[in-house]
Amino acid sequence: MAPGNTLPGCVWPPLTTPGVARAMCSLSHFIVAACTGTLESAVGHNRAALEAFREAGMFFGAINAQIGLAALLAPTAPTEELIALISRAKEEMRDTYMQHHETQLLLVEAFIAIRDGHRDHAAVLIERALAMRPVSDLYMLRMVPHVLPDILAFALRERIGQGRIRQWITQYCIRGGRDAPEQWPWPIKIRTLGGFGLGRDDRPLSFKGKIPRKPLELLKLLVCAGEEGLPARAIADKLWPDVEADAALNNVDTNVHRLRKVLGIDTAIKSSQGRVAIDTSQCWVDAWAFERLAANSEPGRKIADATQGTLALELYRGHFLNEEGEQAWAVAYRGQLRRHIVSLVQNAGTALQRNGETRAAAKLYERALALDNLAEPLYRDLMHCLREQGETAEALKVYRRCKEMLSIVLGIEPSKETQALAATLRD
């Protein structure tokens, strides 16, 4: 047995021991404050608990308090301060019965690395955490909102230890934030890009007998409406425009109920104060994930790179509802998403070209054009890339392809800008 296993604090001392009652009281206040999101208060209570645990000689309590403090401070504190705190906790738990809780500290370190833009180092830290034995119960990290979900979401995106990560999420009922990826074990997944599909608990949701068309149309409308949903009156006007107002509102209520039954989870669809919405804590929607990615890739926001472009194309498997929805609201939303994919790929491609990675940019443009062969700006970008690579003949082939598609499908000529670019290629 390692010497540390015999340290005082292995068992709870009597509550009459100096500092014990104060430590437990502060710890309780810390947990409540952390779980309710009052983080400044949580930090104060945690520091008080740490001091009292040390006074009482409660080794395990002091270690847990340090883990909690590191997690609380991780989003905003200077890196040097956090690493010093984590290093001290690691040193204190080394060769003791608490050493397996280094898992939690490694995960906090990974969060800091992600925050600071060191994604490769974060991946290494998560892999080390997953290799620790025995397995930690992540108790203190589960007390702190955002930190643990963000780490687990990163691991899933990077395909690190997905089995263990998903097991933790399920075992400890960890809810993903709105930015959690598709790989998160969402209760409901709604796919609308490239066609419509539903999944529950990672299995395709199929229908026996008649397809519930109106509840599914309601769901598609709610996707178009975004996370805030729509007033019931607006839903009635869009789905039952020719029905008397009160009867149309009754139809909304009826089909909300039917949709919940279809999904198998009543809480997946929220209805409150005359407004209906998809619950983002229960449901993942591919179109919304794509929109968030597009928003983060705009000039002036996060730097667009090949990763962003690849992620966008992984999500954008085709146009919204694959052209099957011809209602005005579906057509409008489809157009919005098509503009997003063009803009996002352009931003990512421009970043690649700026770094001299013209071949990677050209591949990105080709992938996007395979999804939307009417996106004239992407033809131009691809032509620029090929010209930079000295492939003038290929660039002219791209122009002819663009001209043919626009003529056949839309009955129009390429823009003057595209024609001018082609003219420079012929010179």
Model feature map: region roles:
Residues 1-9, 13-30:
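Extended amphipathic alpha-helical coiled-coil/heptad-repeat regions
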Residues 149, 153-216, 266-277, 318:
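Short boundary/linker motifs that mark transitions into or out of structured domains
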Residues 210-220, 239, 244-264:
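DNA-recognition element of transcription regulators
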Residues 1-9, 37-48, 77-88, 124-125, ...:
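Helix-turn-helix repeat elements of alpha-solenoid scaffolds
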Residues 18, 26-29, 33, 56, ...:
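A structural signal for the main folded, soluble domain(s) of proteins
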Residues 64-67, 80-134, 385-387:
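Ankyrin-repeat and related helical/solenoid repeat scaffolds used for protein-protein interactions
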Residues 59-62, 66, 71, 98-102, ...:
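Intrinsically disordered, charged and Pro/Gly-enriched terminal/linker segments
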Residues 7-18, 47-58, 87-95, 128-137, ...:
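Amphipathic alpha-helical segments of tetratricopeptide repeats
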